Design a protein with these regions (language model features):
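Membrane-integral, polyisoprenol-dependent glycosyltransferases
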Residues: 2-364, 547-555
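Membrane-embedded architecture of ER/inner-membrane glycosylation machinery
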Residues: 2-10, 187-191, 269, 304-563
Length: 563
């Protein structure tokens, strides 16, 4: 195994070598993630569930028990709820125009922190240019862009994983006999483990642990692990994660352990959960899409990675990627964001291949010409498909084409065409620069303009707007029948209830100021129950939309009791 000092790596331009690089990557991330952060309504289902549970914590003052209305939500640890509650409080509370966005702030900060940490790891062990290119590539990744805009766990988990892997790298990369790690560094490693556990359970342990096993086998020595001070370090991780675990176990009478481990984790390991099953290899098949636009450069980097497989920095990245990737592929339940914690290492390898001055075309960086061209063609097809999806989604609802969606699609296609043309000519660095800069425009138009402008998917905000227009002075309790998505709770509040058409009719009979929202297969039951109770309902308006969580169109009508 060879060991190259990071100072020997290609350095790149002056701004890449200087601390200015961190400011540039931060600004790049903000330019990518801010569009749409406030404009996209609450997304079903996970984001809305997380945010609603956090809202209820703030309403009740109970920051131990996790609930979605009256139902205990014990599948995930508490960390992200605390972060969302703190962010919303610091932001001055919810925004009445779009309540969800303050709950997204921890995801934004997690994504920004992850790309900055990726830059730091790359600069330290692969060189300034590789670190900069890798961090920019990770930032522009389609999957991270989606997670940075959603009030979920995955973007902040990514930060915890990257921080832990930075500590692991500092312990393993130096040769035997190196000076002990500074106290702050090994404490940071174990703190990242503890925070990662508190955010999403054992994922951070799996990624760091499997990487540590591979690195130990690679070096045939265990002594490097002592540099992480495992015994006091484990106590630090436990001090972060254990108090809440004990509190919720007592509060739930052990239900958290049985539901999170037995009901959630074991179910995912044993079989496909919630119709999210896929065979092994699914993540590999998804990679060209969800790592876009960087997937072009990651795939073209494969020969470079093979040639440099004995480089310690490359071994570190491969240990980060391969064992956990195989583990994720082996689990029947598959969702695209599961492999996000491995993407920083992929981005760093792609950045290192780009920065290698000896790795130029026409040799295609080690690919035979037909192989490199096949990769470029695949990448072009993905770009064309992404633009087509934006255009196909644009007219959802009224059938009219969307100018914003069309602009976003053409921006994606322009980035695809320009990047492919330069890559085909062998100018990979120029292609990367164009693609990454162009992604700010293309993804900004997509997330900042095209998606918020859609009508059909955003059913709950339109219901809320219709009700306000008809009853601006206020209304009584709201019951929704035929549409049970949690985004409705974000729109109408914790007191809104889901039920049957008969429940909706009874509510109108009991409360003259109540509102019933009825649609789907509950309309007939609602009308039958009204007739039986001799109650007359007055329609306030109708909202037609597309329930993307179920993949079907729906029509909902708002009612109040007729005077």
């Amino acid at each position: 195994v060879t060991d190259f000092d990071h100072q020997d790596r290609p350095a790149g331009a002056w701004f890449v070598r200087s601390p200015v690089a961190y400011a540039l990557i931060l600004l790049f991330g903000l330019a990518l993630y801010l569009p749409g952060l406030r404009g996209i309504p609450a997304v079903d289902r996970d984001e809305s569930r997380f945010a609603q549970a956090t809202r209820q914590m703030r309403e009740t003052g109970d920051y131990v028990d996790i609930r979605l209305q009256d139902e205990a939500r014990l599948k995930k640890p508490i960390g992200i709820y605390w972060l969302q509650a703190a962010a919303t409080s610091l932001a001055g509370g919810e925004d009445t125009a779009n309540p969800i966005w303050t709950y997204r702030l921890p995801s934004l900060l997690g994504a920004l922190g992850a790309i900055l940490m990726t830059l730091a790891i790359g600069r330290r062990w692969l060189g300034a240019e590789a670190g900069f290119a890798g961090a920019a590539m990770l930032a522009a990744t389609l999957l991270l862009g989606m997670e940075a805009r959603q009030a979920k766990t995955d973007a902040f988990l990514l930060l915890a994983v990257v921080a832990a892997m930075a500590g692991l790298a500092e312990a393993w990369m130096p040769p035997p006999g190196a000076a002990p790690l500074p106290r702050w560094l090994w404490i940071s490693f174990w703190a990242a483990i503890g925070v990662g556990i508190l955010v999403k359970g054992p994922i951070v342990l799996m990624v760091a642990g499997l990487a540590a096993i591979v690195l130990t086998v690679s070096d045939r020595r265990f002594s490097w692990l002592n540099r992480l001070r495992p015994w006091p370090g484990i106590l630090i991780a436990l001090a972060i994660a254990l108090p809440w675990l004990i509190a919720i176990t007592i509060s739930s009478h052990g239900a958290f352990i049985t539901q999170s481990l037995g009901g959630d984790m074991v179910a995912k390991l044993a079989g496909a959960k919630e119709s999210h099953g896929a065979p092994p290899g699914a993540y590999l098949a998804m990679f060209p899409v969800i790592f876009w636009p960087g997937s072009l450069f990651a795939l073209l980097a494969l020969p470079w990675v093979w040639r440099n497989r004995r480089d310690r920095a490359v071994i570190l990245c491969l240990a980060w990627i391969i064992p956990s990737w195989l583990a994720f592929e082996a689990v029947p339940t598959k969702l695209p964001h599961y492999v996000l914690p491995l993407y920083p290492a992929i981005a760093l390898l792609a950045g290192a291949a780009l920065s290698d001055r000896l790795n130029t075309l026409p040799s295609a960086g080690g690919w035979r010409p037909w192989g490199a061209r096949a990769v470029i063609v695949l990448w072009v097809l993905v770009g064309l498909a992404l633009g087509a999806v934006v255009i196909a989604a644009a007219p959802l609802g009224d059938g009219r084409p969307s100018v914003r969606g069309t602009l976003a699609a053409f921006a994606i296609w322009a980035v695809t065409a320009g990047g492919a043309w330069l890559a085909w000519r062998g100018e990979r660095r120029q292609a990367a620069g164009l693609v990454l800069a162009g992604s700010v425009v293309a993804l900004g138009l997509t997330f900042g303009m095209a998606i918020p402008a859609l009508d059909a998917p955003w059913i709950a905000p339109r219901l809320k707007e219709t009700l306000f227009q008809k009853m601006p002075a206020g209304h009584g309790p709201v019951l929704i029948a035929g549409y049970a998505e949690p985004s409705a709770l974000i729109a109408f509040g914790t007191d809104a209830r889901f039920g049957s058409g008969a429940d909706a009719a009874r509510l109108l009979g009991d409360d003259g100021n109540a509102v019933a929202i009825v649609g789907g297969d509950q309309a007939d039951a609602f009308k039958a129950a009204l007739d039986e109770a001799h109650t007359t309902a007055e329609p306030l308006g109708t909202v037609a939309g597309f329930n993307y969580a179920k993949g079907k169109r729906i029509v909902l009508t708002l009612y109040r009791r007729a005077p």
